[in-house]
Amino acid sequence: MSSIQCLNPKAELARHAAALELNISGARGLQDVMRSNLGPKGTLKMLVSGAGDIKLTKDGNVLLHEMAIQHPTASMIAKASTAQDDVTGDGTTSTVLLIGELLKQAESLVLEGLHPRIVTEGFEWANTKTLELLEKFKKEAPVERDLLVEVCRTALRTKLHQKLADHITECVVDAVLAIRRDGEEPDLHMVEKMEMHHDSDMDTTLVRGLVLDHGARHPDMPRHVKDAYILTCNVSLEYEKTEVNSGLFYKTAKEREALLAAEREFITRRVHKIIELKKKVIDNSPDGKNKGFVVINQKGIDPPSLDLLASEGILALRRAKRRNMERLQLAVGGEAVNSVDDLTPEDLGWAGLVYEHSLGEEKYTFIEECRAPKSVTLLIKGPNKHTITQIKDAIHDGLRAVFNTIVDKAVLPGAAAFEIAAYVMLKKDVENLKGRAKLGAEAFAQALLVIPKTLAVNGGYDAQETLVKLIEEKTAAGPDIAVGLDLETGGAVEPQGIWDNVTVKKNSISSATVLACNLLLVDEVMRAGMTNLKQPQPE
């Protein structure tokens, strides 16, 4: 009897070979699920929730988040792979495949009697050599629009069909370039993703400004304003109760009317200060007739205040979302104010066009033609919910791919070129490695081929035949020329315009190696939680 079973007779235990088999079966099971999703030729998965909601996706991160995984090892791999997506924005499926293949290659060695510690030493040596090659293999290049388009297109074509991916690529790259400031990393939170159930997915577009998901709340307000001054504020323009419990008493009806009038006057004075600012910048200017005035307030505006603003031709929006207030300020300029006591023309932003768009019962307000917007909106359109969700997930990955390229200032040849180069290099260098760790290093090199092998199978080609072609071409080409897989012909090609992120590849290989080594060194799996200690209650 094991020590844990002495302490807890109800504990479940798997030791040595059984523990290793448990870990490897979990990793390979998850690998088999994810394998067919890899690359631009990958297939889709249909996820059906308990409520009947349907989601079509080939994004590994979405799959791992949505699937209910019970196996402890598979669950651990899923969490590690989704963490990879959280940090770098991509590489989830590749990480799962690499972990599964590392454990698969190690299984045969361990079953032949090689200690798992020796295997992990070989893995760690090969991982170090691979990351050294990555630093030499990457292409440092000036961050220009053409390069960013190629990187983003490579990422999006693995998530969407080719025509849609090429269309959205332009929008994503222009969005990041619009918010980018010299010498600083772009803040991707300044790219708003607005959904609109309308038209086709090819109508997804970039708005160089902001789109708000609500409209004016007064029928007499203008719905189309050109050359608009915009006041961004967080001021209550409605009667609010006091924060503490308080009461006001009156003796007669006249006193009650006076009380109500005083409350109304307090709000009206605030509205008049906004109207005075409007008159100052528009009515008193020579070309004021051709200009408009817009108020966007984070707090509420009551009907009497809306009446006053509408009578002056002011378009007012109330209860704007907090997350949009900073974006609005960066898009139109000016300063967001918390009080109307000291309003000046310098507080105002400007937009060339503000208009309301109605779609069924929903209303949207577009703020466009901003002078130098530092915040933009990607307007995601689609005929149904699952199409919009699929595009939104892909845009997230595209934004991160562009961001990583700007930060890294380098890219990596794609189409599995790095994995082929690393395999050829490791097979050559492993000859200089002494001892049994050489077997682990060879297994690591073999595991790297899971990426080109899977890409070939998903493209409809024979895996072994394709691998032989690629390895022969790479060996003949030499270390300085990248050789990748051409999914149109199934042959070898030097990748042109197909780039991977350096950060994504580095994190994927590192995290896969660490997790595979940890799982190989597990010699006991114990299920001994408190739930197992509870005794059944007698009836």
UniProtKB/Swiss-Prot annotation:
- Biological process GO terms, please? protein folding
**What GO molecular function annotations does the UniProt record carry, in alphabetical order?**
ATP binding; ATP hydrolysis activity; ATP-dependent protein folding chaperone; unfolded protein binding
Q: What is its main location?
A: cytoplasm
Subcellular localization: Cytoplasm
Gene Ontology CC annotations of this record: chaperonin-containing T-complex
UniProt entry keywords in alphabetical sequence: ATP-binding, Chaperone, Cytoplasm, Nucleotide-binding
Record carries keyword Transport? no
Q: Which domain of life is it from?
A: Eukaryota
Please describe what this protein does.
Molecular chaperone; assists the folding of proteins upon ATP hydrolysis. Known to play a role, in vitro, in the folding of actin and tubulin.
Q: Which PANTHER family match?
A: CHAPERONIN (PTHR11353)
Under the subunit heading, UniProt states: Heterooligomeric complex of about 850 to 900 kDa that forms two stacked rings, 12 to 16 nm in diameter.
NCBIfam families assigned to the protein according to its UniProt record, in alphabetical order: chap_CCT_zeta
The UniProt similarity line reads:
Belongs to the TCP-1 chaperonin family.
**Name recorded for this polypeptide:** T-complex protein 1 subunit zeta
Q: What is the lineage of its organism?
A: Eukaryota, Metazoa, Ecdysozoa, Nematoda, Chromadorea
Originating gene: cct-6
